[in-house]
Amino acid sequence: LGASVLRVRRESTDGPVIVHLADGRSFAGDELLVAAGRKPATDNLGLESVGLIPGRFIEVDESLRAVDVPDHWLYAVGDCNGRALLTHMGKYQARVAASVILGQDERDRASGDVVPRVTFTDPQVCAVGLTESQARQRGLDVRVVTYETGAVPGAYTSGEGIKGTSMLVIDQARHVIVGATFTGPGVQEVLHSETVAIAGEVPLKRLWHAVPCFPTISEVWLHLLEGYGL
């Protein structure tokens, strides 16, 4: 953003973190999160011999083939293609590439939208699929439904005063979920059910019959669907 950090200090153990910028400004916060991103380790692989530029992400198609390599014989999976820098997505891409190579064409397309991700903070933050803004940018007519995660009986097993929000992004035309975000303790364990619902394009009226156990965080499903009007 055009700003240079001069120094970062915490005056006391329980005090705020203060970030001092080179232009004289300073900002205070409870904690400081450093997220500088990652650079692809594609140097010294001989990529230049096949027309690729070393040190950059390798652009691939939905079958994980490098698009800039003639005859598309080179596959790139995992962090090196820059699609989703997550271990589980790298493993998924490897399975897709293997199915393509073996001729199992029913699984030869890697989804770029259904990417589950978890931030292991306290409380946890997790999401899968599209955000509301991403969905609208694609021309989808979406509705957002939210519910307080801490209001679910299962949340009380983590203690009183639990805070967090659960949110669904719903495609109004197809009545399916295209995105979901959860915050709160233990919500990462709910994420896979949302991933299945999005990847399978399961209609909301079918999901209504998926009964969550009491008392678990999964009961947030019921409240979200009720909030939608089911």
Positions of PLM-derived features:
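Short, acidic, Ser/Thr-enriched surface-loop or helix-capping motifs
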Residues: 21, 61-62, 171-172
